[in-house]
Amino acid sequence: MDLKSLIRDVPDFPKPGILFRDLTTLLQNQAGLRYVIDQLVEKHANAGIDYVAGIESRGFIFGAPLAYRLGAGFIPLRKPGKLCAPVYAVEYELEYGRDRLEMHQDAIEPGRRVLIVDDLIATGGTAAAAAGLIQKAQAELYGFAFIVELTDLAGRQKLPDVPITTLVTY
């Protein structure tokens, strides 16, 4: 399936000079959404994944059905202040400042295998922070899965040396 044909390009969003890859058009396409989840399942079905960790917010959209299909638990990695129990937190750089990802401290048992999922990898800062959360929990980071990779931004170079799955590259 040609996934690029299902992804809308939005020039100058969220600011001038940025070409935004809008996955909402992929999500509304039943065959496209099914294909994406099926592809991710096929690539990770035999990896012994205990948990899928989805990065807020679009990582939730792809991560939860993937976890279900893999027979794994789902862990939401949230922006600051969204979780109600004690958290691990990792700060990361944005082009316009800093942000933070958080995860409940009791979300993952030490030694469990985790696959991190998000819709897109650009600079890699958010995904690297997610990996830091998994490390703080003393779990095993199995790998990453992204629908889209923006290769010019070299985000995968910031990530640990684990398997990285992408379905579409620009």
From Swiss-Prot:
Its main location: cytoplasm. The keyword Cell division does not apply. It catalyses: AMP + diphosphate = 5-phospho-alpha-D-ribose 1-diphosphate + adenine. Pathway: Purine metabolism; AMP biosynthesis via salvage pathway; AMP from adenine: step 1/1. It is found in: Cytoplasm. It is an enzyme of class 2 (transferase). The keyword Glycosyltransferase applies. Keywords: Cytoplasm, Glycosyltransferase, Purine salvage, Transferase. Belongs to the purine/pyrimidine phosphoribosyltransferase family. HAMAP family: Aden_phosphoribosyltr (MF_00004). Catalyzes a salvage reaction resulting in the formation of AMP, that is energically less costly than de novo synthesis. This is Adenine phosphoribosyltransferase.
